């Protein structure tokens, strides 16, 4: 039974939205139990003297009334409430905070921009895979936070007073999506970035991660339009041109952009364009968590794992009672196959990691039923929270597991956007073969298989006499050759001369 003492909550009183995260600690990470979000647009209630309007404050208080009911079941020392840019700026913030604290029955901490950047970085470090050296970008409603670091340690924390709500009111107040408005918004953001750009570039990074609603919106757009998951400057410029053609904010229609995000999307896009150009960012991916996750992990005092994906996969193996030895056996075999063909098939370390991940949980569907276990596996992966994996990577893993045995379904392989289609198909072929060869679940029955490729033709070269000595697996390989030929993947079986 889940007791209230095991629950934690983090509330973020942002400039655009108020958010609440309710979670519990499980296996070194947090399990989300509830997320509640309300668009309050607090920053829109600031006048020229930086006073919050009564209407804006009322919207905020009404939202906190909703939050307070859920908080009644959680110990007070396991709740953190923080306020960010707008309440840092508002001259009458005390009036809002006094009433807000009465509603929640909890203290509210107005955190500095640098502390906000630190917490965002911690949320990313605990939930997002990839290289250790990272740049984290979060475009909020009233401010933009930038943080660099290695592993759990931050090296630079910056907060700039520009956000998607304030930029909307300043540069798109006439609701026109004309090129001039975009130009002014971008230019203002670039001028704000220039004093800090050089020092950020000097820190360097191996991966750039976006942790904001703007980046989430971009990810949704790219998935809807069948693009890969990496945000790049050409893609941002293409979206800007599309927005300009829509002419009016009320008429903004982009496939994959929800109505809820549309209002502040152009202003957030202008800021992101400026960040990409000033910091010379090549690609950006979506973070797995940010400020609220950073608050919860901070209360739990959990260390940052060196390999978040490994922790996630190990948790799945324990939860679903998987045969870890068999998973390793299949993984080792698949890795051996990949290394033999990596150069000819252009399979890099990213492909290697994703294939390894699929192997380590390939039997997860058996926890539901042997029948249709690949479909069960795909469902479980698709609908599980997998810290360290991006949404596109999750989709690819589910697709590989769906196609691990039986006839191949090319459709999901072509619809995933984590890898080019031909790379995803090649990983699928290697996974299927590794599962066949490891089917006896013993190390001493694995043959020394050599792989040769010519274009898409894959040749398996086996020791002399192996096929006749292992009739069941020989039959499985012959069936596999037929299944692969149906989707134009030539698979040839050969033996070395005696």
Swiss-Prot record:
Pathway: Purine metabolism; ppGpp biosynthesis; ppGpp from GTP: step 2/2. GO terms for molecular function: exopolyphosphatase activity; guanosine-5'-triphosphate,3'-diphosphate diphosphatase activity. It holds the Pfam family Ppx-GppA. Its EC number is 3.6.1.40. InterPro entries: ATPase_NBD, Exopolyphosphatase, GppA/Ppx_hydrolase, Guo-5TP_3DP_PyrP, Ppx_GppA_C, Ppx_GppA_N, PyroPPase_GppA_Ppx. One of its GO terms (biological process) is guanosine pentaphosphate catabolic process. Gene3D superfamilies: 3.30.420.40, Exopolyphosphatase. Domain 2 (3.30.420.150), Hypothetical protein af1432 (1.10.3210.10). SUPFAM superfamilies: Actin-like ATPase domain (SSF53067), HD-domain/PDEase-like (SSF109604). It catalyses: guanosine 3'-diphosphate 5'-triphosphate + H2O = guanosine 3',5'-bis(diphosphate) + phosphate + H(+). Keywords: Hydrolase. Catalyzes the conversion of pppGpp to ppGpp. Guanosine pentaphosphate (pppGpp) is a cytoplasmic signaling molecule which together with ppGpp controls the 'stringent response', an adaptive process that allows bacteria to respond to amino acid starvation, resulting in the coordinated regulation of numerous cellular activities. Belongs to the GppA/Ppx family. GppA subfamily. HAMAP family: GppA. This is Guanosine-5'-triphosphate,3'-diphosphate pyrophosphatase. It comes from Pectobacterium carotovorum subsp. carotovorum (strain PC1). The gene is gppA.
